[in-house]
Regions:
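Sequence-level detector for tyrosine residue identity
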Residues: 15, 80-86, 152, 160
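Short glycine/proline-rich turn/loop motifs
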Residues: 52-56, 109-116
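Short boundary/linker motifs that mark transitions into or out of structured domains
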Residues: 2-65, 69-70
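DNA-binding patch around the recognition helix
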Residues: 26-50, 115-165
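Short amphipathic alpha-helical recognition elements used for nucleic-acid or partner binding
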Residues: 61-109
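Generic structural signal for short, flexible, solvent-exposed coil/loop and linker residues
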Residues: 54, 72-73, 78, 133, ...
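Short, charged/polar micro-motifs that form catalytic or ligand-binding hotspots
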Residues: 58-63, 79, 116-124
């Protein structure tokens, strides 16, 4: 007999409404060369790889992300260089923002899902979005790696050479 998921379907809230800053910058030391920055334009859903050359910013590449993809990418970028727990990703995915209350609710839901034997079903929508996000972050030389029974972490993609200016 198939078990039913505890997940309630919600559309992620746009970061445009939740975030006062329209463009967020991430230096990601260890993932990007010195002087390189990722700029996430939350209203447009674009992630740009920037470098400053001759005191002028230059864009090396850019990728477009959906709202759902931004909802899982933001907590990963915020957590770097540390891992991002499953409950934080689930909270951000479901509500568009990983507040302490949302994280506590997600932690409880995941514990209940684990006890009911439907943990995989509960996390499947997040994993599907992470899979699409992973394909896009690879163009920046960034891998989204799974840590068994813990969460996800951003890592340098092996054999990736960052574009020259």
């Amino acid at each position: 007999m198939q078990k039913v998921s505890l997940r309630k379907v919600k559309t992620p809230v746009s970061y445009l409404q939740e975030n006062s800053e329209e463009v967020l910058h991430f230096s990601l030391q260890g993932l990007l060369p010195t002087g390189h920055t990722l700029a996430l334009n939350t209203p447009l859903g674009t992630l740009s790889h920037l470098v400053c050359k001759d005191d002028r910013p230059q864009m090396l590449m850019e990728q477009q992300f959906t709202t759902s993809e931004i909802c899982v990418l933001m907590p990963l970028l915020d957590a770097y260089p540390y891992y991002c727990p499953y409950e934080v990703l689930l909270a951000s995915f479901n509500s568009g923002r990983a507040s302490e209350a949302a994280i506590a609710r997600s932690r409880k839901r995941l514990q209940e899902a684990q006890e009911a034997g439907i943990w995989d079903q509960e996390m499947r929508p997040v994993r599907n979005v992470l899979s699409r996000t992973r394909l896009k972050t690879r163009s920046f030389g960034i891998e989204i790696s799974s840590i068994l029974e813990t969460g996800y972490i951003l890592m340098h993609l092996p054999r990736y050479k960052h574009p020259e200016v």
